[in-house]
UniProtKB/Swiss-Prot annotation:
Its EC number is 6.1.1.17. CDD domains: GluRS_core. One of its GO terms (biological process) is glutamyl-tRNA aminoacylation. It comes from the Bacteria. SUPFAM superfamilies: An anticodon-binding domain of class I aminoacyl-tRNA synthetases, Nucleotidylyl transferase. The gene is gltX. It comes from Vibrio campbellii (strain ATCC BAA-1116). This is Glutamate--tRNA ligase. Belongs to the class-I aminoacyl-tRNA synthetase family. Glutamate--tRNA ligase type 1 subfamily. Pfam families: Anticodon_2, tRNA-synt_1c.
């Protein structure tokens, strides 16, 4: 048997982190088993669906790198197939027409609540029975599935263990509306059957749907897939994760500067573990993942831990991979990195100081763009008269360097200035940093100067000396 899993979101909004984790688990299980992963868009809610939401889901999946083998399939393109199966159940008396109006059903429900009974559809209720018997062919009706009245539905959930639900707890659900459109629970079953889905990985909010769907599988003579229901994700306050906890959309995390590898690593650990290991390559995730190692308890989303992971991936990933995802942020800042050092070299130097790609993009402008003025605080503190002589000597030695390397800048410029003027490193290091970067924070100034380049460094040191001269003249 070829394992086949699916991710089946509804296009009523963005791809949120809970859905992304479900997709990741489903994708990983298929990969682990040498199987296939299907993407299906469950768009039967015609009033709430939007193309914008479809695009957001596809964009999120592609950004996370969760490639699908089949799809995306759209349920709205399969209505003929669903109706064919509804008619099959009608012919076999496994479904029936119901003519009870919404008003009548509300009235019956109110009676049940008044009698302290569980509100539910009851085909044998005198009022409902009378409505169905009095109806004439051609009148608007829904089609209901004839749920078994005896026995139980039992299934072995791969995460939660054995689950048993009595058929007496389930009523006859609607499988086709009065407008002829099929309903969610029915479409899902037909889709999973037609697409050969063997394992259904989804959120625990679907547990109540599962016994109903199993009864429909069996009524159709379809194989019942194996189910795995993931626990919910909570915010750090213990409440269900929502917009009030901050970002919940996958693409919001892209916008905030997270790498997809970091988010995937974080999401896989929100419920699944392999010993004490925290960091997993994609290959390790695929090789080690199993559904029975997923916790049935809810997990709390911790942004600090995600940020720590993101910093790890920025520092330790192939700089070309980081550069690929950094480009979007550079575009947002309109920073052209073609006029300067290789972006991969800048990432290697600056990346370890950054928790997000937003921070990284904000910190590297001076490698590529000249600045008209220095940061006020840094200039006030470090570009003073006392820095004039060290910077003048540094300028002369920089201009004299024939090989512009970190080692030569360190020894032939910075160390040489300290030795000749008999000053400490701080007397030249900080003024030089402000001169060449425009601010007071950067990685090692000799390495920064190598990447900025000799011509730019010389011009910027001259600019700093002009700033000092003007400052002294106005003192």
């Amino acid at each position: 048997m070829t394992v086949k899993t699916r991710f089946a979101p509804s296009p009523t909004g963005y791809l949120h982190v809970g859905g992304a984790r479900t997709a990741l688990y489903s994708w990983l299980y298929a990969k682990n088993q040498g199987g296939e992963f299907v993407l299906r868009i469950e768009d039967t809610d015609l009033e709430r669906n939007s193309q914008e939401a479809v695009d957001a889901i596809l964009e999120g999946m592609e950004w996370l790198g969760l490639e699908w083998n089949e799809g995306p399939y759209f349920q709205t393109q399969r209505f003929d197939r669903y109706n064919e199966m509804v008619d099959k159940l009608l012919e076999e008396d496994k479904a029936y027409k119901c003519y009870a109006s919404k008003e009548l059903l509300d009235e019956v429900r109110a009676e049940q609540e008044a009698n302290k009974e569980m509100p539910r559809y009851d085909a044998n209720h005198p009022k409902i029975k009378a409505a169905n018997e009095a109806a004439k062919d051609g009148e608007p009706c829904v089609i209901r599935f004839r749920n078994p009245k005896e026995g139980s539905v039992v299934f072995d959930d791969q995460i939660r263990g054995r689950i048993e639900i009595s058929n007496t707890q389930m009523d006859d659900l609607i499988i086709r509306r009065t407008d002829g459109s099929p309903t969610y629970n029915f479409c899902v079953v037909v889709d999973d059957w037609d697409m050969g889905i063997t394992h259904v990985v989804r959120g625990e909010d679907h547990i109540n749907n599962t016994p109903r769907q199993i009864n429909i599988y069996e009524a159709l003579g379809a194989p019942v897939p194996t189910f795995a229901h993931c626990a919910m994700i909570l915010g750090d306050d213990g409440a269900k994760l929502s917009k009030r906890h901050g970002a919940v959309s996958v693409m919001q995390y892209r916008d905030m500067g997270y790498l997809p590898a970091a988010l995937n690593n974080y999401l896989v650990r929100l419920g699944w573990s392999h010993g004490d290991q925290e960091i997993f390559t994609q290959e390790e995730m695929i090789n080690l993942f199993s559904l029975n190692a997923v916790s049935k308890s809810a997990s709390a989303f911790n942004t600090d831990k995600l940020q720590w992971l993101n910093n790890h991936y920025i520092k330790n990933s192939d700089p070309a991979y980081v550069a690929e995802h950094l480009q979007w942020h550079l575009d947002q800042q309109k920073l052209d990195v073609t006029n300067g050092p290789a972006i991969t070299e800048v990432i290697k130097l600056v990346g370890e100081r950054c928790n997000t790609l937003v921070e990284l993009a904000e910190q590297i402008g001076y490698f590529y763009e000249d600045f008209a003025e220095f940061e006020a605080g840094a200039a006030k503190k470090h570009l003073r008269g006392v820095a004039k002589e060290p910077l003048e000597l540094a300028l002369a030695k920089a201009e004299a360097l024939t090989e512009w390397t970190t080692a030569n800048i360190k020894d032939g410029v910075i160390a040489a200035v300290c030795e000749e003027l008999e000053i400490g490193m701080g007397k030249i290091g900080m003024p030089l940093r402000v001169a060449v970067t425009g601010g007071g924070q950067s990685p090692s100034v000799d390495a920064v100067m190598e990447l900025i380049g000799k011509e730019r460094c010389v011009a910027r040191i001259k600019m700093a000396l002009e700033f000092i001269a003007e400052r002294e003249a106005n003192a």
